[in-house]
A protein has these predicted regions:
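HotDog/MaoC-like acyl-thioester-processing domains
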Residues: 2-19, 92-97, 103-177
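Short, flexible turn/loop "capping" segments at secondary-structure junctions
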Residues: 27, 78, 149-152
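Short coil/loop residues immediately preceding or within conserved phosphate-binding loops
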Residues: 30, 81-83, 113
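Solvent-exposed, flexible loop/coil residues
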Residues: 39, 46, 50, 76-77, ...
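Generic detection of intrinsically disordered/low-complexity segments and helix-coil linkers/edges
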Residues: 45-48, 82, 105, 160
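Short alpha-helical interface patches
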Residues: 49-57, 68, 144-150
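Hydrophobic beta-strand-centered segment that forms part of the acyl-chain substrate-binding groove
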Residues: 62-106, 127-129, 133
Length: 177
């Protein structure tokens, strides 16, 4: 684990835990970062793996600033990613300021669906979609319990139709097995 990421993680944890749980969390969550030379590959742009690492930080931010953190700490929920898909649109050179935008799109009985975007001055540089869940010591946590902790009434009841990208992502992931 890169020390650069450890310091960023520590900063997010301190920032989130020093504040009370958001009663009505503002999602999407927005985090600002800068590409450091240690985030870059030989082509002198942010390495592909680092996008996923930053997105991990975004999901930690969503979890810790909301009441999901009570499930994480008190009920020992562990976040798990089932499927991820990313589309790179533009390269991020060193020292570029960017914003990571993380949002929960929907859920079904088991899975929670997220979209995360990396933007520079509002312009899309990468977009990723994740299907994940929380696992407790006694098994998977039903997604509606997670949504209740978010206190977002529009997401407590799952929609009947997910955005098309999630169906396509699932179809591709099943072909890879």
């Amino acid at each position: 684990l890169n020390m650069n990421l450890v310091f960023r993680l520590i900063w997010i944890v301190i920032k989130c835990l020093s504040r009370p749980v958001a009663r009505n969390p503002k999602l999407p969550s927005r985090l600002n970062f800068r590409v450091m030379p240690t985030d870059c590959d030989l082509n002198m742009h942010m390495t592909n793996a680092r996008y996923f690492s930053f997105m991990d930080l975004g999901r930690v931010d969503v979890m810790l600033k909301t009441a999901i953190r009570h499930g994480f700490f008190k009920e020992r929920w562990g976040p798990m990613i089932g499927t991820s898909f990313i589309r790179f649109r533009r390269a991020l050179p060193p020292f570029t300021k960017f914003q990571l935008v993380s949002d929960i799109i929907d859920h079904d009985d088991k899975w929670i669906y997220m979209e995360q975007r990396i933007e520079v001055q509002g312009e899309l540089y990468a977009v990723a979609y994740f299907k994940g869940l929380f696992r407790a010591p006694d098994g998977n946590v039903e997604s509606h319990r997670v949504m209740q902790k978010l206190n977002r009434s529009e997401l407590v009841e799952s929609r009947t139709e997910l955005p098309t990208v999630f169906y396509q992502m699932e179809k591709v992931s099943r072909q890879i097995q």
